[in-house]
Amino acid sequence: MIYGVGTDICDIRRIAATLQRRGDRFAERVLGPREIEVFRYRRAKVEARGLSYLATRFSAKEAFSKAIGLGLHQPMSWRSCEILNAPSGQPQIHLHGALADWFAQRRLIAHVSLTDETDYATSFVVVETQGL
């Protein structure tokens, strides 16, 4: 059964401006530990790839927070939710700490889809309850 649906569109130019103003502090506030490694790796290779990565993760976390109905209120936080790619490239949501506990107690599973173009990153999340 569907528990919630969330979507978000993010202007990559706004993320770029924020990153320029605040430096890596912005990325470190939004990204979890494994995400920050990927961000730095991608940005070192091609600046635009790092920026797109940050924007898609920002967008996906916004969409996820909407799908679970919490917004960015505890136990949901930027760093407690990571969007990591499986070896196949499929994005997957990995949760940590109190958010992982909250999610497990409700027997929820999440599916995420990401896309980006030159100026925009978009995410769609469906959260469903696991069968009894």
Swiss-Prot record:
**What transmembrane ranges does the database entry give?**
none
What are the subcellular locations of this protein? Cytoplasm
Q: What is its EC number?
A: 2.7.8.7
Query: Where does it mainly reside?
Result: cytoplasm
Magnesium in keyword set: yes
> What does this gene product do?
Transfers the 4'-phosphopantetheine moiety from coenzyme A to a Ser of acyl-carrier-protein.
Protein family membership: Belongs to the P-Pant transferase superfamily. AcpS family.
- This chain's protein is named Holo-[acyl-carrier-protein] synthase
Q: Which organism is it from?
A: Leptothrix cholodnii (strain ATCC 51168 / LMG 8142 / SP-6) (Leptothrix discophora (strain SP-6))
Q: Which gene encodes it?
A: acpS
